[in-house]
Amino acid sequence: MAITDFFAGEIATELLKQLFTISTTAWRYKNTAKQLLTLIDSIRPTIKEIQYSGVELPAHRQAQIGMLFDTLEKGKKLTDKVLSSKRWNLYRQLTLARKMEKLEKTISNFLKNEVFTHILADVHHLRADTSVRLDRVDMSLDRVIQQVGSMKIGGGGLISEAMKRAEAMEIETNDDSEKFGVGLELGKVKVKKMMFESQGGVFGISGMGGVGKTTLAKELQRDHEVQCHFENRILFLTVSQSPLLEELRELIWGFLSGCEAGNPVPDCNFPFDGARKLVILDDVWTTQALDRLTSFKFPGCTTLVVSRSKLTEPKFTYDVEVLSEDEAISLFCLCAFGQKSIPLGFCKDLVKQVANECKGLPLALKVTGASLNGKPEMYWKGVLQRLSKGEPADDSHESRLLRQMEASLDNLDQTTKDCFLDLGAFPEDRKIPLDVLINIWIELHDIDEGNAFAILVDLSHKNLLTLGKDPRLGSLYASHYDIFVTQHDVLRDLALHLSNAGKVNRRKRLLMPKRELDLPGDWERNNDEHYIAQIVSIHTGEMNEMQWFDMEFPKAEILILNFSSDKYVLPPFISKMSRLKVLVIINNGMSPAVLHDFSIFAHLSKLRSLWLERVHVPQLSNSTTPLKNLHKMSLILCKINKSFDQTGLDVADIFPKLGDLTIDHCDDLVALPSSICGLTSLSCLSITNCPRLGELPKNLSKLQALEILRLYACPELKTLPGEICELPGLKYLDISQCVSLSCLPEEIGKLKKLEKIDMRECCFSDRPSSAVSLKSLRHVICDTDVAFMWEEVEKAVPGLKIEAAEKCFSLDWLDE
């Protein structure tokens, strides 16, 4: 798309506004103005389609668009003259009236020729080309799925590479606010010009946080010209402030060389094989990290570096600027009012003053605008006063942003604001498991799950976090452990900025802003006094006994341990956290970690929620100290190691109050241990994405309190034991993507409280006749080709909904 196309669209819009004014105020031009108004309004959707299509038109059609641009430009100047003409100057009014009639004829004649036929043909070609690219994505994903099928789920680098390549091929549609402004189009043109005029090299996109650097980079990744130039060989990686450089180097090596990412990475030169490749490195913080990631000498390789700092040569760097005043007002109004202009009757000066306080920064405009949505003018005045007083001594945009973001939190109630600040406990550029977040809010703020979810949605609506799009989100029986939220770096900086105020021992949240090799020095310098923090978040690499020092947390209720290593010594001070309710242990390394000093769990008598991710689950025995108040346990990407298989093991003695057990993506789980059926307090059991699970225990009927049973995406599971039909309280059964299952248990009709069955992508050939007795059933999700099996049940059970779902394959679980 040429820049001319964009301005043609803008001028058409302005011309329409002026023609509307003329048609209602200037009687001599009224009829002509109305005709022009109808004419231009009819072609504006077509101009808009061309404007945003991304198609680079041939030269002769560019010339024709240029002619239209000139005509509309003349029309705008003419309407300016009409609106400024005096009523007593009859000669000038008659002259202008004739010119308007001539303008109407010119545009009308222009539309009668074949120009728009040709242009619409180009739009048609774009659609056809998009269809081809979607087919290519489908075929590429099929290849990725085949690769994943031959790998272990915890396999590390090669799977991460597959995930990143799938991300690089992803086609998305963002909302209007993400693609806002002429600046984005100009930025794309300038960056493409830099990259296309070279045979490779390192180029940069720089600018302050929240200005739209990543948005521009993602638009370039999806740009048709860029994809054609690099023949879809594009890798997009997020580096972050505390990167795992060696893993990233392996991913880049695998992408450029075609070898497996796990292979050694030699520093050597390679001959040019004619294949151009693009590596986009987002959120790079240091020159050292950039040098390490661009040390390969591959001819034809282009690297695009996205950073808040200028890390590349000035002549090869595009500086993303803030929005112009008009663009800023339009974006602000879109977020505050749901439209791109100030509504009639609302104080224009007030809107402009508040928007101007955001200094053209897109993120500040979006967050501040969303926070004012639906608020009265007096509230706006109060916000304006607070913003105007927030100018820091340092006049940089970064400093102003944090103060403006803080003002955006003023209309949140204290609990919602606290929940926002809790987000600073998670590492940057990592997806936050929704289940972990909800559990923390429930335990820390004494709210129930429904209120926690409402706060989540509220923060999302105010653009203070990004909630992943998932059709299950918010449904009654939805699982949250494989749904994620994300947060922009600047918003995380705000949470850290507010949480880290004051003396370190007096903070409610003790947080590490980024990954470090050791604990922060000021923590050790102040460890002679206890810490009052309720949330403690530690983000390190491998930790041994000597790296920990003594600390006291008498009020700590939440502990989050993020690390990247294959072995990890748990901090000894956990044993003194007598109030600890939630423990989250996440290994971001490439293989499961062995945890040492698990014996300290014996002192966690109040622990209610335990999340273990990518670790070896310790062996359980009858001598294991019971966790008497543990209600929820999640084992994600873990090695189970037959932890529950000890002869005579009474799991109920160890976890007497466990109500929710999740085992997800654990590739060494072959059979569900029968000892788990001793957990008579269990109300929710989720065994999901376990590729080797082939057998369920025969004594499932012992789980008399069970209400939710999820068994989805277990491809080796061939049968469901009949004992499932002896679960009197079961309300939800999910067996979707269990492709080896061929039937439901014959006596499923005994489940008198069963409300919902999800059986997508199951190869069923029949349905049990007893299903007509499922009088509480209200929702069945199945494939289109088996929906007919439920017609008889649909007639027998009033209010039953049979939903024929489309097949959906996802690699989202690989995203981290």
Swiss-Prot record:
SUPFAM superfamilies: L domain-like, P-loop containing nucleoside triphosphate hydrolases. Residues 95-111, 399-415 form a coiled coil. GO terms for molecular function: ADP binding; ATP binding. Residues 191-443 form the NB-ARC domain. LRR repeats lie at residues 681-704, 705-727, 729-751, 753-774. InterPro entries: Apaf_helical, LRR_dom_sf, LRR_Zer-1, NB-ARC, P-loop_NTPase, Powdery_mildew-R_dom, WH-like_DNA-bd_sf. One of its GO terms (biological process) is defense response to bacterium. Gene3D superfamilies: Helical domain of apoptotic protease-activating factors, P-loop containing nucleotide triphosphate hydrolases, Ribonuclease Inhibitor, Winged helix-like DNA-binding domain superfamily/Winged helix DNA-binding domain. Pfam families: LRR_Zer-1, NB-ARC, RPW8. Keywords: ATP-binding, Coiled coil, Leucine-rich repeat, Nucleotide-binding, Plant defense, Repeat. It comes from the Eukaryota. One of its GO terms (cellular component) is apoplast. Probable disease resistance protein. Belongs to the disease resistance NB-LRR family. The LRR repeats probably act as specificity determinant of pathogen recognition. This is Probable disease resistance protein At4g33300. It comes from Arabidopsis thaliana (Mouse-ear cress).
